[in-house]
Each structure stands twice: as structure tokens, then as C-alpha cells.
């Protein structure tokens, strides 16, 4: 099973990022930089789960990946993707290590 973990931190809401509750309500995480290596792992894996974290407020939700839609490129050239998620449900908080883009891909 492959899991995509994305971070929706409360402290980024002031600068225009979508809040954890907005991701939970819409099922869309906006503009996450996913490296080509991470994308290839996700693209070749069936049944990908998604974990949405807010480490600031210690919140966690889990769902199923529906689609990764490329959006604009980041200033560093990294490709940004909107992450579409279905069946999001909240769970007790459990942290995960993230890269500097607020993303990690876990393959079990």
C-alpha cells in the first residue's frame, strides 16, 4: 500500500494556503510540490491512501487519492499538483516526517 502524506499547516492560512478544515470540506489539497520520483511511485501504485496533517493544531484526516492535477511550477521549478481526495475522515493525530515541501510518500 502506498500513502501520500500532505501538510495543511494552520500557520500558512494567513498567506493564502488552504486550511486543514477547507481540505477536509472540499477534498482538494492545493498546489503541493511533488517530485518526479514521488510522482512516478504514485503513478505506478494502485489504491493510494492520502493523509492530511495539520501539525500546528495536531489534526489528521485520511482518505483515498482520486487524482493529481498539475498546476503551475514553483519558483524552484518543481511541479505543483492539486491533490483530489475522496472519503476523507478525521482520525486521532499521529505525526509523520515530511520533506521541505510538506509532502512524503510512504510505500509499505
Give, region by region, the residue ranges found by the protein language model:
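Compositionally biased, charged N-terminal/linker segments
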Residues: 1-44, 55, 90, 97, ...
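A broad, low-specificity signal marking well-ordered, structured residues that form hydrophobic/aromatic
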Residues: 3-4, 50, 82-83
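Short amphipathic alpha-helical surface micro-motifs
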Residues: 43-48, 64-68
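Short aromatic-glycine motifs in intrinsically disordered, low-complexity regions
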Residues: 48-58
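Aromatic- and Lys/Arg-enriched surface recognition patch
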Residues: 56-108
Amino acid at each position: 500500500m502506498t500513502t501520500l502524506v500532505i501538510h495543511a499547516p494552520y500557520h500558512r492560512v494567513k498567506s493564502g494556503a488552504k486550511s486543514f478544515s477547507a481540505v477536509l470540506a472540499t477534498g482538494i489539497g492545493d498546489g503541493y510540490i511533488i517530485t518526479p520520483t514521488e510522482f512516478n511511485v504514485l503513478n505506478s501504485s494502485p489504491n493510494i491512501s492520502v493523509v492530511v496533517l495539520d501539525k500546528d493544531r495536531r489534526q489528521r484526516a485520511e482518505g483515498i487519492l482520486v487524482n493529481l492535477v498539475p498546476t503551475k511550477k514553483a519558483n524552484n521549478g518543481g511541479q505543483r499538483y492539486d491533490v483530489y481526495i475522496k472519503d476523507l475522515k478525521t482520525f486521532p493525530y499521529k505525526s509523520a516526517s515530511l520533506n521541505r515541501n510538506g509532502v512524503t510518500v510512504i510505500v509499505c
